[in-house]
């Protein structure tokens, strides 16, 4: 385990996170353990497999099953209003073909933080791990893609992807007292994003009940670019 002032920050990025998963696998092979790990969206999912010390698990999910209609696809989007099937990812099928090491995860001394965007406030809420069942609900909330997934609820509060409010949560690690911070990004340094008037209009219609969320969705890409720099 590294010294207590070292933190690991993991950006999300859907299938781009396979790169991040590879970096984490190397950390595990070299027995590099950070005492504090924080992630959003796919980064939070990768972090869970990093803490359970299951080399290759994150990559296998997104490589071996990317074409599996049980896991991802527009058919599931039309039927269940979500492009990802979280019941497949966290449910019985996963336990059969790639069981998660809950004991290793629950017995780890590493601090694990997951960020999700509160739809009512447009701000990031942070959750620490509890039981595995509670964790799966938190991870679903953090990975709920805007427009492509139905809202997730925790204690009656609606949430979407943690990357909307805080894609690279370095500020949270700093606020928690960590001075040495390693950040794994899933976008190239040269990444630039142009705001889309059409997409912004869709946000305003789709999330009209949540004006703070709409504002955050519209601002999201500019914030990502600023944090990367």
Describe each PLM feature range.
Residues 1-40, 48-229:
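Patatin-like phospholipase
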């Amino acid at each position: 385990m590294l010294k207590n002032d070292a933190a690991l920050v993991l950006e999300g990025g859907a299938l781009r996170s396979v790169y991040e998963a590879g970096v984490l696998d190397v950390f595990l092979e070299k027995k590099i353990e950070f005492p504090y790990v924080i992630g959003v969206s796919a980064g939070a999912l990768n972090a869970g497999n990093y803490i359970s010390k299951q080399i290759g698990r994150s990559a296998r999910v997104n490589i071996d099953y990317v074409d599996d209609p049980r896991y991802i696809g527009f058919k599931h989007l039309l039927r269940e209003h979500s492009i990802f099937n979280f019941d497949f990812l966290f449910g019985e099928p996963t336990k059969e073909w790639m069981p998660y090491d809950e004991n290793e995860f629950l017995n780890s001394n590493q601090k694990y933080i997951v960020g999700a965007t509160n739809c009512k406030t447009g701000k990031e809420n942070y959750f620490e791990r509890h039981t595995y069942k509670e964790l799966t609900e938190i991870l679903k909330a953090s990975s709920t893609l805007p427009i492509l997934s139905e809202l997730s609820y925790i204690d009656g509060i609606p949430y979407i992807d943690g990357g909307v409010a805080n894609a690279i949560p370095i500020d949270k690690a700093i606020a928690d007292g960590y001075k040495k911070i390693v950040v794994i990004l899933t976008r190239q340094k040269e990444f630039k994003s142009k705001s889309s008037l059409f997409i912004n209009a869709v946000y305003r219609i789709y999330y009209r009940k949540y004006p703070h969320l709409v504002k955050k969705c519209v601002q999201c890409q500019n914030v990502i670019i600023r944090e990367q720099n």
